[in-house]
């Protein structure tokens, strides 16, 4: 990976990634207000009003509250998570209807196994000692697993049919049911499940493709899962949000007057929308391919995937059914430079002038900085 794309494939706890981003936000002076529940968004201002009555005005509101939203007092008072179609911020962009949320047939069964529990079994110890993402695929399911925190924990995620209300957290899965489900798979899997302290069940889902991520005023914009939530079968959901952030930063870097923000948000959407929705489709399709039941289609899939491990046969094959490893799709996905793409696009339609450089040295666009 590093030889091909210039960077390694990092295996990281999502909470640790959040901490890295949070620390950097504080370093550059961001004012972050946690436990802030949004009661109203005025997209014309724009402004955001919290349930405690505080109101914040800004030049731009960036909605990054994901497929789930705690932006309503109902979410706080009843301890029930509201799905993203109830998001106050998204409702300021899509005014006339609720956005459809599309549950996947599968749930993700997530757990973290202490690395020390795996150390006494040679088969399991090898998974910790040799950092790599391991994937098992089979009938109506797959498993993705890898070590994190220098082997202190082993992230273990099983995906197979199940149902739970979208956005409901902390529903526990039966470990006995998991062992029964995977007893005919690789014996290592049941060994791992036997070490699981607890397993939480999460409904995989995506939202419908939106025609716009921008409010009518151009002063509220959606990024990340709020605009393109996808199923996890390409492991690209967080990556797309980071790419969004890079692209929107490049757009805001061209601002010489706040009146330009709506136009630049339109350019941001043009830069990002097609790629995000191609990844969204690719993730769904990859899940369908991984989860094929035993039969002819599965046998053909396995044959084509095996060909990709043999250089001579790979050259004559028509690609890998596993898009993660496909010789055409993988470079397009992993080799993408979001900053370079944004700069190239903006250079042609919105070049940075000397005046803009001087202006940007003296002014910062006021964006909302709320974690909801």
Give the residues covered by each predicted segment:
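Conserved mid-domain beta->alpha element of the FAD-binding
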Residues: 62-63, 80-81, 109, 145, ...
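Short, flexible helix/strand-to-coil boundary loops that buttress conserved ligand/catalytic motifs
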Residues: 75-76, 92-93, 193, 234, ...
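Amphipathic alpha-helical interaction motifs in eukaryotic regulatory proteins
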Residues: 22, 26, 39, 72, ...
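Conserved FAD/dinucleotide-binding core of flavoprotein oxidoreductases
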Residues: 1-9, 13-14, 52-54, 98-102, ...
């Amino acid at each position: 990976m590093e030889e091909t794309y210039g960077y390694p494939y990092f295996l990281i706890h999502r909470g640790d990634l959040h901490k890295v981003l949070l620390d950097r936000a504080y370093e550059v002076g961001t004012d972050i207000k946690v436990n802030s529940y949004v009661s109203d968004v005025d997209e014309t201002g724009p402004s955001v009003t919290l349930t405690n009555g505080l109101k914040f005005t800004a030049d731009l509101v960036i909605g990054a509250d994901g497929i789930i939203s705690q932006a309503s007092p109902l979410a706080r008072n009843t301890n029930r998570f509201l799905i993203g179609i109830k998001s106050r911020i998204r409702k300021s962009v899509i005014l006339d209807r609720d956005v459809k949320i599309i549950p996947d047939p599968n749930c993700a069964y997530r757990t973290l196994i202490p690395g020390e529990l795996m150390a006494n079994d040679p088969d399991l110890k090898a998974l910790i000692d040799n950092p790599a993402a391991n994937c098992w695929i089979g009938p109506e399911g797959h498993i993705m697993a890898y070590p994190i925190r220098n082997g202190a924990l082993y992230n273990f995620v099983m995906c197979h049919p199940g149902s739970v209300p979208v956005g409901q957290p902390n529903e526990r899965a039966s470990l006995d049911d998991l062992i029964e489900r995977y007893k005919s798979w690789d014996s290592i899997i049941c060994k791992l499940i036997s070490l699981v302290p607890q397993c939480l069940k999460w409904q995989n889902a995506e939202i419908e493709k939106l025609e716009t991520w921008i409010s009518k005023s151009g002063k509220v914009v959606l990024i990340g899962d709020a605009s393109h939530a996808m199923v996890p079968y390409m492991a690209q959901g967080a990556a797309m949000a980071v790419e969004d952030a890079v692209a929107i930063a490049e757009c805001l870097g061209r601002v010489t007057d706040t009146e330009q923000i709506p136009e630049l948000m339109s350019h941001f959407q043009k830069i990002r929308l097609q790629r995000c929705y191609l990844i969204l489709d690719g993730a769904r399709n990859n899940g369908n391919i991984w989860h094929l039941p035993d039969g002819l289609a599965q046998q053909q899939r396995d044959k084509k995937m095996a060909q990709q491990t043999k250089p001579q046969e790979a050259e004559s094959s028509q690609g890998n059914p596993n898009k993660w490893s496909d010789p055409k799709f993988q470079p397009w996905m992993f080799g993408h430079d979001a900053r370079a793409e944004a700069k190239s696009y903006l250079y042609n339609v919105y070049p940075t002038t000397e005046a803009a450089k001087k202006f940007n040295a003296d002014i910062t666009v006021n964006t909302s900085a709320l974690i909801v």
